[in-house]
């Protein structure tokens, strides 16, 4: 049975699932769909064409689905899709997509968005990610599964952050970060590998292989793209090489790599 506070304002066109809790002074617009078990604390605002997945919990003063902060937006239909089992903490803002992007913003499952996180239009966030307090994603950013982004970090539009990577706090990232890398700074560059996350997700032999692969990719005698192409040729049908090297070759903004910044030493790995 759903629990809805008397002071909540809910459009008759909104769809509310079973066991939903809606706290005091929430405002729920016409195009909202709340799946079973969603919990809204007090003073949450949901607008636009927004879907919230099962058992997601949204804390006070969160604003989801309001008009994108993009001057090119002219009121076209767009969506915000939030998956299951997410925690969205106080004062977060997530905007829907635009005509200039994929027309939707997507948040996957089991993510933690800490207080004051901003996710702009057309962003895609995977599963099991943690965005710490004050993280800002500009438009069209892509974040893979199991990514951690430290507090007060800003991500430039169209940047991609691949699976298992970590961006240190107070960073400003303007280029792509491949799988399992650790980046830091303003501007942020890859400092090493996120071996802590690798140990959680991978077998030891795969960790060692990835470590050796990045040492070869970052060799000084070839460009990063040349190294990636060479690795794909020499390790055809290897899924790890395919994942990492294809990501590098698909980069439009370039990879956040500088030889003077990267270290393969163990002290960088945790």
UniProtKB/Swiss-Prot annotation:
GO MF, one example: acyl-[acyl-carrier-protein]-UDP-N-acetylglucosamine O-acyltransferase activity
Reactions catalysed, as given in the entry: a (3R)-hydroxyacyl-[ACP] + UDP-N-acetyl-alpha-D-glucosamine = a UDP-3-O-[(3R)-3-hydroxyacyl]-N-acetyl-alpha-D-glucosamine + holo-[ACP]
Pathway of action: Glycolipid biosynthesis; lipid IV(A) biosynthesis; lipid IV(A) from (3R)-3-hydroxytetradecanoyl-[acyl-carrier-protein] and UDP-N-acetyl-alpha-D-glucosamine: step 1/6
Membrane-crossing segments per the record: none
Gene Ontology CC: one annotated term: membrane
Pfam families recorded: Acetyltransf_11, Hexapep
SUPFAM superfamilies: Trimeric LpxA-like enzymes (SSF51161)
Superkingdom assignment: Bacteria
Major localization listed first in the record, in broad terms: cytoplasm
Enzyme Commission number(s) of this protein: 2.3.1.129
GO annotation, biological process: lipid A biosynthetic process
Subcellular location: Cytoplasm
Record's keyword terms, sorted: Acyltransferase, Cytoplasm, Lipid A biosynthesis, Lipid biosynthesis, Lipid metabolism, Repeat, Transferase
Purpose of the protein: Involved in the biosynthesis of lipid A, a phosphorylated glycolipid that anchors the lipopolysaccharide to the outer membrane of the cell.
Family, as annotated: Belongs to the transferase hexapeptide repeat family. LpxA subfamily.
Subunit (UniProt): Homotrimer.
Name the record gives this protein: Acyl-[acyl-carrier-protein]--UDP-N-acetylglucosamine O-acyltransferase
Species of origin: Helicobacter acinonychis (strain Sheeba)
Lineage of the organism: Bacteria, Pseudomonadati, Campylobacterota, Epsilonproteobacteria, Campylobacterales
Gene from which this protein is expressed: lpxA
């Amino acid at each position: 049975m759903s629990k809805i506070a008397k002071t909540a304002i809910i459009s008759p066109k909104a769809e509310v699932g079973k066991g939903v809790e809606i706290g005091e002074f929430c405002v729920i617009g016409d195009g909202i769909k709340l799946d079973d078990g969603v919990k809204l604390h007090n003073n949450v605002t949901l607008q636009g064409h927004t879907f919230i997945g099962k058992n997601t919990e949204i804390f006070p003063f969160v604003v989801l689905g309001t008009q994108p902060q993009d001057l090119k937006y002219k009121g076209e239909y767009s969506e915000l899709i939030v998956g299951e089992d997410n925690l969205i903490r106080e004062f977060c803002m997530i905007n829907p997509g635009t005509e200039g992007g994929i027309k939707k913003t997507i948040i996957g499952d089991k993510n933690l968005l800490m207080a004051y996180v901003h996710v702009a239009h057309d962003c895609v966030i995977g599963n099991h990610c943690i965005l710490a307090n004050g993280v800002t994603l500009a438009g069209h950013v892509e974040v893979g599964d199991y990514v951690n982004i430290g507090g007060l970090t800003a991500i430039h539009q169209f940047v991609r952050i691949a699976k298992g990577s970590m961006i240190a706090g107070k960073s400003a990232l303007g280029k792509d970060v491949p799988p399992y890398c650790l980046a830091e700074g303003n501007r942020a560059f890859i400092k090493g590998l996120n071996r802590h996350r690798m140990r959680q997700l991978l077998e030891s032999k795969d960790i060692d292989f990835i470590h050796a692969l990045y040492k070869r990719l970052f060799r000084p005698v070839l460009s990063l793209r040349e190294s990636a192409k060479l690795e794909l040729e020499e390790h055809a049908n290897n899924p790890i090489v395919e994942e990492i090297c294809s990501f590098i070759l698909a980069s439009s903004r370039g990879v956040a790599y500088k030889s003077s910044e990267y270290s393969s030493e163990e002290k960088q790995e945790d």
